[in-house]
Regions:
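C-terminal motif of bacterial Sec signal peptides marking the signal peptidase cleavage site
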Residues: 15-19
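Extracytoplasmic small-molecule ligand-binding "clamshell" domains
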Residues: 29-100, 236
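Periplasmic-binding protein-like
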Residues: 42, 118-126, 195, 199-242, ...
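Short helix-initiation/N-cap motifs at beta->coil->alpha
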Residues: 61, 76-88, 170-185, 220
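Extended ligand-binding regions for polar small-molecule ligands
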Residues: 61-70, 136, 141-142, 147-150, ...
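Ligand-binding cleft/hinge of the Venus flytrap
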Residues: 64-73, 151-172, 202-207
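Acidic, polar ligand-binding/catalytic clefts
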Residues: 65, 74-137, 216
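A ligand-binding cleft/hinge motif common to bilobed small-molecule-binding domains
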Residues: 100-109, 154-158, 181-218
Length: 261
């Protein structure tokens, strides 16, 4: 009986070792997810916006499709609350911020940026019949901007001008389109906005209706926002962006949306 028991115990131990040991190959890992979720504001023409058919189009959309496609990724564009973009990135809800995203010192504390790929300015736009001609004329006026935008940062960085505005700061709107509409309705006196968007918008709506002031709130550059931890991904994107600039693809895509530039 003891011998039989010992044999049974030996068999059980052998089976246990076979199941737990390293002699059997480990299961193959699941295929890497190649989808990249990109956070966008779908009202930011011509970088990323809806066409008449409701399709998401624009310079950044074309650029992202080409660049990520070359790297073997599948881009997925996710419309987000632009004021929450860095939070969405940090929480892992999106993988990139890529939609006319201005490089600023405050944003560098939250995200890593690729190289700059497009120049921009924060310009002042009024209706054509406005008596506003200079920054000084904004004193006591209501100035519209997009919420949590680089336009807001640029105005507030000019402390002397910001202090003179009605309310001591710009009025913030969810989108630049909402801000423009408030100016058109006469509730706001001016809008501070990305030149890239403004030139496209006023050309579409009728340039004769608007006035662009000679003064502005400074020059800036657009970059792609990447999570701080994703350093290898950042390098991968940067290298491919450089390749696209060098081989002419970048300029070809840019020409579709900025024919005069």
């Amino acid at each position: 009986m003891k011998k039989l028991t010992a044999l049974l115990l030996s068999a059980i131990m052998a089976l246990s070792l076979t199941a737990c040991g390293g002699s059997e190959p480990a299961p193959a890992p699941e295929a890497e997810d190649k989808t990249v979720v990109i956070g966008v504001d779908d009202t930011f023409a011509p970088m990323g916006f809806r066409d008449e058919a409701g399709e998401l189009v624009g310079f950044d959309i074309d650029l992202a499709n080409e660049l990520l496609g070359r790297l073997g990724y599948e881009p997925k564009f996710q419309v987000i609350d632009w004021s929450m973009k860095e939070t969405e990135l940090d929480n892992g809800n999106i993988d990139l911020i890529w939609n006319g995203y201005t490089i600023t010192e405050s944003r560098k504390e939250k995200v890593n940026f690729t190289q700059a790929y497009l120049d921009n300015k924060q310009i002042i736009v009024t209706m054509a019949d406005s008596d506003i001609a200079t920054k000084a004329d904004l004193a006591g006026k209501t100035v519209a901007v997009q919420k949590e935008s680089s336009a807001y940062e640029a105005v507030m960085a000019d402390a002397a001008t910001a202090a003179t505005l009605a309310g001591g700061e710009p009025v913030q709107f969810d989108t630049n389109t909402d801000a423009f509409m408030d100016v058109e309705a006469g509730r706001s006196d001016a809008i501070v906005v990305d030149e890239v968007l403004a030139r496209y918008y006023i050309k579409l709506r009728g340039e004769e209706q608007y006035k662009v002031l000679a003064e502005d709130f400074g020059s800036e550059e657009y970059g792609i926002g990447v999570r701080k931890a994703d350093t290898e991904f950042l390098a991968e994107i940067d290298a491919e962006l450089t390749e696209m600039i060098n081989d002419g693809t970048f300029d070809e895509i840019k020409g579709r949306w900025f024919s005069a530039q």
